[in-house]
Amino acid sequence: MFERETLPDGATILRSERCSHTFTRLRPGVLLLRIVGNDRGEFGDAPMDFVQAEMQRFRTLVFFIDMSGVEGVVSRVREAWTEWLRLQQSGLTRVHMLTGGSRFVTTTVSVSKELSRTGEMIQIHTDPERFAEAIARVVGTRARPA
């Protein structure tokens, strides 16, 4: 079970007891997702449905995912995102993923990148500054990860 809330700045947050997904449209066709906590699958397809709606609205999407606050993720969630990324390649211009300093998250994302067969469409960042620079290049302003 989870709650969905639209924040005053227009961001949308999906929140459960253990995890949150915050979606922020940085500009049309550019979406930032911040995931914090331990994702046990309580959101079902809701996160992917949100991203899919953005892709339909803007035709293509540059997708930034900040996973530096992730503590854990169950296999079915990882597998669902891997398959979703594989199937949605045509609508995704680029995917930037910030894993932060977690070896677990970096390894998990690296495996998912290979299994999704997306090639260099997915860029993995371990340094928050590099991630912020990638956002700035796309958006045109300086953005800082949480």
Where are these predicted regions, by residue range?
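Amphipathic, Lys/Arg-enriched alpha-helical "gate/interface" segment within cytosolic domains
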Residues: 1-146
